[in-house]
A protein has these predicted regions:
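Cytoplasmic C-terminal tails of single-pass
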Residues: 688-699
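Carboxylate-rich, polar loop motifs that coordinate divalent cations or form catalytic acidic clusters
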Residues: 1-683
């Protein structure tokens, strides 16, 4: 009964994965008065030339910057001639301002002054949303070519290229639709009966496949027949897929490959194939297995190989002499000198390898062999390096263990090493548990001391957790706990791919990723796999415009017209202000990060940016009189900084006593005071002298 339940669970998860891959992704966000919309009855929509969204309602005009709604309407004493705030329509005029119909009157909303103006001969029509008719749905095509339709009754459908129209989600995904607008970024806005909807269509990057039972992927491997093997921990299975990505079957304990869900006898942590075609499996905690004699690729003979220093096998590598090097967690590195023999001989570190550092390298995670026959081992206590030799001389091999050193800056950044990889130039990269990636700079890998270049948070990388690292074209790809980081070793530039990129929460496993026969990369997850084509590992090219959404001076709210200003002049009694801004990326507003800088010399060559995370305001206090330049920039939806710097010049007016004439006057007053004091002293002394002379003459 339990087996039937597992099979059913797996089948459902596979069906779910297929469905998720076939159905395009869209995010639907609903807004109403609870979110700040000034009134639920929206009569029209428009997007201005900068990208800001505007909505006409029966309670004035409403602006949305991606974070908050703000209303604009007539106020008593503001000089506006609006008799009512019942907006019937809004449209974008050719001059960049907004036209508004208020009942039967026409007004211009001046975006430079943020005021309603009654002018003659104004443009009576412009760009705004399209009405949805009962017999004419609104059509929108997303970035990958899917055709979306919004129907009058609220139905939302999609039609892939060459496919058929299919309902999205429930039969009625939205409230009854009245108007629709496709913005400059490709988002779809729907004005419904009592709310508005924003529908965004994120780029689908790869495919996340959950295995349904929370099993961690421990090993992925491609054999010589272009089949790929996936071993998972909790359910103790080994799945085999053909080059067409079809499931061949499960590896059974007796060596057969069976179609139904079948457990292997223990969790498999590593898989490799030797030159003679044998498949070797490393497990925890049952040691080493050899698979030979494949019959039509459907059955193997399985031999258990004993004699290891530990039965926790994490990696297996074959050197050019045909020997196997086994990484064990607890028994160090072991060598199988004759792997083809019926009973292979195992050389263990604590008896056969006489120079092995027993105290430092007991727990080995991974082994890397270079073309120059240098073995580099990732251990929990450092990087173990040795030069391979031929024949029985392995017993006299010399090992060097490199660890983190407190007083050497170019030492290994973290002793807990995860894996080792080479790039296309043969440079060696070492991933660590919490110290990022290290590149070996020393030419001689077997030197007593190695020098490392660090790629970590201290040097600009987004994370220090590097579960593994692999060569990726002319760059390196680091696998973090929840992200992938592609970086250029020469200049340190990087691209970070996280939750926003995957459109899902991904927790990566320690399994080293592999390139599949179809060109995609396969990454192990804590509960499944992530598949992605190399060309999909790229960043969004959209550069959001930054709008200045408001300013507060000395705690008093100022005009929204700051968005149209190049220069803001503060009075002599105004020394502190808060500037609010928003990058107009409606597909990822809450995921954007910001930074600002304050320049007092106008030099933008070497700007020191203040990163403020997701906060979209900057407060500057107690400014001295003078002219400043405030710079604001943001990331895009993928977290990459883009070239969208917004500049605002701030002129702080000095008080009279801070001006040059006041300083001159003060100097003159001081000189006059000192001059008067000196004159008085001299006068008094002269009088005293005259009195003394008169007294002497009298006597």
């Amino acid at each position: 009964m339990r087996l039937i339940t597992l099979v059913l669970s797996l089948s459902l998860s596979l069906l779910s994965a297929v469905s998720a891959a076939a159905t395009p992704i869209c995010h639907i966000q609903r807004y109403d008065e609870n979110d700040g919309l000034t009134q639920w009855h929206v009569t029209q929509m428009a997007q201005d030339s900068q990208g800001m969204m505007w909505f006409s309602t029966w309670n004035g005009l409403c602006r949305f910057d991606g974070y908050e709604f703000r209303g604009f309407k007539g106020r008593v004493g503001d000089g506006s001639r609006l008799a009512t705030d019942r907006m019937r329509s809004v449209w974008l005029c050719d001059d960049g301002n907004l036209g508004c119909r208020v009942d039967d009157d026409m007004y211009l909303f001046n975006l430079k002054r943020y005021r309603f103006e009654k002018i003659g001969g104004m443009q009576l029509r412009g760009r705004n949303a399209t009405a949805v008719k009962e017999n004419r749905p609104y059509r929108h095509r997303d970035g990958v070519g899917n055709l979306w339709k919004v129907y009058y009754d609220g139905r939302l459908t999609y039609t892939p290229r060459g496919g058929k129209e299919t309902p999205y989600g429930d039969r009625k995904s939205l409230e009854a639709a009245r108007f629709c607008l496709s913005d400059k970024q490709g988002n779809l806005w729907v004005a419904a009966t009592s709310c508005i909807y924003k529908i965004s269509f994120p780029r689908q990057n790869g495919n996340v496949v959950r295995n349904g039972n929370g099993a961690e992927v421990k090993a992925v491997f491609v054999d010589r027949y272009k089949r790929y093997w996936i071993a998972t921990k909790e359910d103790e299975t080994v799945r085999i897929f053909d080059r067409g990505n079809r499931l061949v079957g499960y590896l059974a304990p007796d060596g057969r490959i069976v179609a139904g869900y079948t457990k292997f006898r223990c969790p498999i942590y590593c898989i490799t194939q030797t030159r003679d075609g044998s498949i070797w499996l490393g497990s925890k905690p049952q040691g080493l297995f050899r698979l030979t004699g494949c019959h039509g690729m459907q059955a193997y003979r399985i031999d258990k190989i004993g004699g290891l220093g530990s039965d926790n096998v994490y990696d297996i590598k074959e050197d050019r002499w045909g020997r196997l090097w086994i990484a064990t967690l607890g028994g160090g590195v072991c060598c199988v000198e004759n792997p083809r023999a019926e009973r292979p001989v195992v050389v263990k570190p604590f008896s056969g390898l006489r120079n092995y550092p027993h105290t430092l390298a007991k727990k080995v995670r991974m082994i890397h062999l270079t073309k120059d026959d240098v073995m580099l081992c990732a251990t929990t206590d450092g990087l173990l390096v040795a030069k391979l030799v031929a024949g029985n001389d392995v017993r006299d091999m010399v090992f060097h263990c490199h660890t983190r050193e407190a007083n050497r800056k170019d030492a290994l950044s973290c002793s807990a090493v995860m894996n080792v990889a080479e790039d296309y130039r043969g440079r060696i990269f070492v991933s660590t548990e919490s110290g990022g990636v290290n590149m070996i700079q020393t030419g001689n890998l077997t030197a007593d001391k190695l020098s490392f270049r660090h790629y970590d948070e201290a040097n600009g990388m987004p994370t220090d957790v590097a579960l593994s690292v692999v060569g990726f074209s002319r760059k390196m790809l680091m696998v973090g706990s929840d992200r992938l980081v592609m970086f250029n070793p020469d200049n340190g530039d990087y691209l970070s791919f996280g939750k926003n990129f995957f459109q899902s929460e991904c927790r990566f496993s320690e399994a080293i990723p592999v390139r599949l026969p179809d060109g995609r990369w396969l990454f192990g997850l804590q509960d499944g796999e992530y598949y992605v084509a190399p060309q999909q590992l790229r960043k969004s090219t959209f550069v959001p415009s930054i709008a200045l959404t408001g300013v507060s001076v000395q705690g008093v709210e100022g005009s929204c017209s700051v968005n149209a200003m190049d220069t803001l002049v503060l009075a002599s009694n105004e020394r502190s202000f808060t500037l609010r801004f928003a990058a107009l990326d409606y597909s990822a507003d809450v995921r954007l990060s910001y930074a600002f800088a304050l320049l007092d010399d106008g030099d933008e060559e070497d700007v020191k940016w203040n990163d403020i995370g997701h906060n979209h305001s900057a407060t500057l206090l107690d400014l001295e009189p003078g002219t400043y330049v405030v710079l604001v920039r943001s990331t895009n939806a993928d977290g990459a900084w883009v070239d969208n710097v917004r500049r605002l010049t701030i002129v702080v007016t000095p008080t009279f006593w801070e001006t040059t004439p006041a300083r001159v006057l003060l100097l003159l007053l001081l000189l006059a005071f000192f001059g008067s004091a000196v004159y008085t002293i001299i006068y008094i002394r002269r009088i005293k002298r005259q009195r003394r002379e008169a007294l002497d003459a009298y006597l």
